[in-house]
């Protein structure tokens, strides 16, 4: 027990109602993994002082760690309203927005934190990290230098510099920069996991595949250790969720599944497209190709079906409720969907709307039931490339990315997702078109013409400028670096790691054969 913990405990015991004491105890409880106790203490602090910026910011941090990002940003905003000059609230807001993929807004918050507290290395490092993610070498250097001047061992700033060095083809300096920092013994952290991943990328580019694989494995181990408390054994993991949906669909009678629309839904697009497949299958590339056409709007990995998810996918009885839905009962879920699209800043009425989410294959029963006129694009890529890419890519924390912490776990998740997707295609009335990644990168014009024909869109040479579209729109997925380039052929990357992939090939073999990649 530290002095601060003991002092706070004693102060509360003698009736001192200063909210700071509750915040101190909450922090220690959270560090000990006692999250419920931490939340209770912070709520007590906010009962005493509802506008206390320290308590509001601390609970926002817990919400962020638990992926309750909306609650987190709302509490940051409340802290800022209470004390606009409280730099820690702006910094936490940057963390939250960055976690949610809202990088432009995150930079604004980090910048305000740095303005208010120029000696805050984390604020400068956050700015550098996002600039590095955007591939902007010039924008990385100043904030990274400021962060490292304050904290020479700052892994976020060092990894940001390393990221742009890799994009510039400078791999050896990355090894020299990151290896000494990562050699120091330290508890697992998200910062170490990210830096290890960047170091693995440098080894990969240098052709040092054994070292790359070992470093990627270490990165995933750190990632798993940091986030393991969020996944106690009694919690359904993402693969379990997929399997449960599959069992429900397998037992359902999907004849006459498509529902008519009871009435017009405000804000609906004239043409509605779902683009799905699996992470790292090429969905971001196709999204930006289509968004290069006039009249096409696209949205990237947003929970547009959240209300329907909660109503129909939350328990085993959900499918019965979905099957018994009348058109009038379905329309509020459709309206909620289009309201989500509008809330993202898109006006899609009169045009084509592309809802890109590689994991919306999970929602094909909902899509078929609620949006029977929608067109569904399914990305296909060599399963070995997908699994290898998911394993070595540094994703933001989600229940899905937690499945990518080992090659075997990644392969089993992919297998579960493909089984559910294929079952959905067999059982449900869906209007689908398959886009093969290998065909897209090797026969771009022919593949995109077929894609446009399916969607009823005019083909244009502007499709070749998808990288400009991506730069203008911004990309929040892990594919940002690839789609900033001109057409990038990522096929057969798995071959250099064939030895490491051998143990999972029996899991992937049926899909390699079924999809024609043998």
Model-based region annotation:
Residues 143, 172-182, 186, 193-267, ...:
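PAPS-dependent sulfotransferases, especially Golgi type II membrane carbohydrate sulfotransferases
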Residues 367-390:
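Conserved phosphate-donor/acceptor-positioning beta-strand/loop module used by diverse small-molecule
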Residues 275-277, 288, 300, 352-357, ...:
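Short beta-strand segments
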Residues 348, 356-359, 368, 375-376, ...:
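ATP-dependent adenylate-handling active sites, centered on carboxylate activation for C-N bond formation
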Residues 303-304, 360, 381-386, 440-441:
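Conserved nucleotide-binding/hydrolysis micro-motifs of P-loop NTPases
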Residues 363:
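Long C-terminal interaction/binding lobes of large macromolecular proteins
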Residues 52, 86, 296-297, 373-375, ...:
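Secondary-structure boundary/capping positions in well-ordered alpha/beta enzyme cores
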Residues 1-345:
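Alpha-helical solenoid repeat scaffolds of the TPR/TPR-like class and their adjacent stem/linker regions
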